[in-house]
Amino acid sequence: LVRDGVAQVVRLARQFAPYCTEVLVSANLNLPHYAEYGLHAHADRVAGIGPIGGLEVLANACTSTWLLTVSVDVLQLPDTLLPRLAQAGGEGAVSCDDDGLQPLVALYRVDALRPALAAALAVQQHSVRQMQAVLGLPHVLFSGAHFGNLNTPEDLHQAGCSDADSAAHRG
């Protein structure tokens, strides 16, 4: 996914680079493509289970204490995202914007996340929201913010994504 000539994953990685020691990407296609940007891509270890599969592979690849997850199809995130989620304390936090809960934009303490994911997957529970509830993650409201979404052709066009750019860089 490319917006205004910049890969969306690179755009997001740059935004959070000051806070991160490494950027991990959950992707099931074109993994070598991400290395061109200095990113480490990982395919789901359990196929076909949705976003929790990506979260599981990232949690197991993560070498730091904390894991910030951001969906690549968000339009924009506030620069205060990570500091505000971190202030919630505990095992992490989940973001909410004016459109509601954003379960794929969250911060996790990795040593709590790994066993929670293992327990959820052991009973075929594939809901990220449910796993977050089991962890007791608080919701942090970003009032006045709309993270947006890049799912439909209209969303992509309005965000500056060309059809050629988007088709060439999916994965």
Regions found by a protein language model. Give the residues of each.
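Nucleotide and nucleotide-moiety/phosphate-recognizing core
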Residues: 1-128, 133-147, 154-156
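SAM-dependent methyltransferases
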Residues: 157-171
